[in-house]
């Protein structure tokens, strides 16, 4: 998860509030100090932190909780709302025909982001093309072409042509039939005058619907200087913050952008083509505080087009085979890293803490389960009850695991089957269908 340290510290502050017997000035002051410390360690601007602290304190001590909400819940909700206000609501890039120009310094992850952004739109049903107008950096053409080829995205570039505005113009002509056209531009190691002029020249040719500034999260509060400089040059309409999963300064970058007239459109949270997320402040803060992001989880399932032929009607009658369980593990594997998926799930409002070691153990256990099921016969997968001691030994040998782990898998399957049977009374067939659909299942 992005900003692990910040999220952990903020959750610690909220847990104090949630476990308190009463809300008073001492409790609020203590929680505010913890929040201040967490934000400052994440490189958020001191003035912004103090302003946020004052608003939280003022509201927590003077506002009356709305009907149906106790004082503790109200204070937690205030913190949630004010954190959203701190980082801004985000820039909405609609799913429609458009041209997008990417700008930014060298090393910001701009080229990789161009391919990720193209993948984002293409997976949502839009024909997408990428134009390489970076004629400055050696290897930019080859890198971007390879990334696009890997994802099946149309690529346009002119190797050897150093006239970036001309390449951009030719690229637009060659990609007229595409819905979304993404123009990748050159960067420099600093805000040099020739870089700014080239951006202006390309902008004059491209006339993009959106000009997105790509920034490395590690620059922290310096993000505001970049945003202002590029905004003056081309009038940027949004920001993409990359590498947010690998720095403690991400809070500074997020808040610095919000301090300017622009806002964040996307965030990069990993290395794969799907690790670019549309930025929505409420969902981001919800995940940061451990409240989950079910909407994001559903979108992730839909994005990788998870399909399964699980028979929902049979499941509702109590039939949940090991084959069904295997399909669910396969679906989870497609959706991305286990830690990222689990952090989209809500756990009691404030979240639970799992160490990296615990996540790794869980991941290895699930992988072992798949190996075990790969060593079973179709008959065993359909009817686990026939798996006796001798079969367990054979399956363990075939999968390179211990018999105890095979038994553990069978117990886990039995528990899941029991839970599904329990849904029949409380959830109902239609609601079960809706749930499966929301988790990426096709209609049944």
From Swiss-Prot:
Top-level EC class: hydrolase
Database matches in SMART domains: AAA (SM00382), SRP54 (SM00962), SRP54_N (SM00963)
Keyword Protein transport: no
Keyword Metal-binding: no
Keywords: Cytoplasm, GTP-binding, Hydrolase, Nucleotide-binding, Ribonucleoprotein, RNA-binding, Signal recognition particle
Listed InterPro entries: AAA+_ATPase, P-loop_NTPase, Signal_recog_part_SRP54_M_sf, Signal_recog_particl_SRP54_hlx, Signal_recog_particle_SRP54_M, SRP/SRP_N, SRP54, SRP54_GTPase_dom
Known partners and oligomeric status: Part of the signal recognition particle protein translocation system, which is composed of SRP and FtsY. Archaeal SRP consists of a 7S RNA molecule of 300 nucleotides and two protein subunits: SRP54 and SRP19.
Protein name: Signal recognition particle 54 kDa protein
Species of origin: Methanothrix thermoacetophila (strain DSM 6194 / JCM 14653 / NBRC 101360 / PT) (Methanosaeta thermophila)
Gene: srp54
């Amino acid at each position: 998860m992005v900003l692990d340290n910040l999220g952990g510290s903020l959750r610690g502050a909220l847990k104090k509030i949630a476990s308190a017997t009463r809300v008073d000035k001492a409790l609020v002051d203590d929680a505010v100090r913890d929040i201040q410390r967490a934000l400052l360690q994440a490189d958020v601007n001191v003035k912004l932190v103090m302003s946020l602290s004052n608003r939280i304190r003022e509201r927590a001590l003077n506002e009356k909780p709305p009907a149906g909400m106790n004082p503790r819940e109200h204070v937690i909700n205030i913190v949630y709302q004010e954190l959203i206000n701190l980082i801004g609501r985000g820039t909405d890039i609609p799913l429609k025909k458009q041209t997008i120009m990417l700008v930014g310094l060298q090393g910001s992850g701009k080229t990789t982001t161009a391919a990720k952004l193209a993948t984002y739109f293409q997976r949502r049903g839009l024909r997408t093309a990428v134009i390489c107008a970076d004629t400055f950096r050696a290897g930019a053409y080859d890198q971007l072409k390879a990334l696009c080829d890997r994802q099946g995205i149309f690529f346009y570039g002119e190797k050897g042509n150093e006239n970036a505005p001309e390449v951009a113009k030719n690229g637009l002509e060659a990609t007229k039939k595409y819905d979304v056209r993404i123009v990748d531009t050159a960067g420099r190691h600093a805000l040099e005058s020739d870089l700014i002029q080239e951006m202006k020249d390309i902008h004059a040719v491209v006339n993009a619907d959106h000009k997105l500034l790509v920034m490395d999260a590690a620059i922290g509060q310096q993000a505001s200087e970049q945003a202002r400089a590029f905004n003056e040059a081309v009038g940027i309409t949004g920001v993409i913050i990359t590498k947010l999963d690998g720095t403690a300064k991400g809070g500074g970058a997020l808040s610095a952008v919000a301090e300017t007239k622009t806002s964040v459109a996307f965030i990069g949270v990993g290395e794969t083509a799907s690790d670019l997320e549309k930025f929505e402040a409420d969902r981001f803060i919800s995940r940061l505080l451990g409240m989950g992001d079910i909407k994001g989880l559903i979108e992730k399932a839909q994005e990788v087009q998870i399909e399964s032929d699980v028979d929902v009607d049979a499941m509702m009658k109590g039939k949940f085979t090991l084959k069904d369980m295997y399909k669910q593990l396969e679906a989870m594997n497609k959706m991305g890293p286990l830690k990222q998926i689990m952090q989209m799930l809500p756990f009691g409002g404030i979240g639970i803490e799992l160490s990296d070691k615990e996540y790794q153990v869980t991941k290895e256990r699930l992988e072992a389960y798949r190996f075990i099921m790969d060593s079973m016969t179709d008959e065993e997968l359909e009817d686990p009850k026939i798996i006796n001691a001798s079969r367990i030994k054979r399956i363990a040998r075939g999968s390179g695991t211990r018999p105890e782990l095979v038994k553990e898998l069978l117990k886990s399957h039995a528990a899941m089957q029991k839970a599904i049977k329990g849904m029949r009374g409380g959830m109902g067939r239609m609601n079960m269908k809706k749930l499966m659909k929301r988790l990426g299942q096709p209609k049944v």
